[in-house]
Amino acid sequence: SYGKHIRPERDLTQMPVQGVDGKPFAFRGQEAAWTLVALPGPDCAERCLRELDLVHRAQITLDKQADMVRLVYLGAPPHGAAAEGFDKVWTLAATSSPTLEDFRAKAPDSVSAVLVTPGGKAMLSYPAGFDPARLRVDLKKAVMVAL
């Protein structure tokens, strides 16, 4: 795997997460979907959004399995012209829980990520500056395991 294994895996099933629409978000749902959680640093703008667009493109390349990976952006919503339409691709959400804070990007306009299993366990982490193409390989492996 390209991502760093989280040991022990963290159970996110009880972590309170709320979408910007006010509805609760569950990491473990009816569908067997993996969740890629984007953890932006302060002030997600042009560079951060460019990386997230590359992640979305990596998801699209999964073709028929693309719907087996949910994209969740956990933090203050991005801003600027580049953020237009972002919420159509990513689920915008927030949490008061510190469970994933040690994986969050620290630098302004940067983003890190965590891959969560269909069972709600944080399994792999990707620090700020990760390569979306290599992340795509991990996503491909994950959805193949789930089939």
Q: What is the meaning of each model-derived region?
A:
Residues S1-R28:
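N-terminal "domain-start" segment that seeds a small globular fold
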Residues P98, D109-S110, L115-L147:
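Thiol-/selenol-based redox modules, centered on thioredoxin-like
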Residues E31-A33, A66-M68, P108:
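Extracytoplasmic
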Residues V69-P118:
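Short, internal strand/loop/helix patches
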Residues G29-V55:
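Short active-site neighborhood of thiol/selenol oxidoreductases, capturing the structured segment around
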Residues Q14, T35, S112:
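Conserved beta-strand and immediately adjacent loop positions that scaffold enzyme active sites
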Residues R47, A81-A82, M123-L124:
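Extracytoplasmic/secreted cell-surface and envelope-processing proteins
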Residues L52-Y73:
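Conserved helix-turn-beta segment immediately C-terminal to the redox Cys motif
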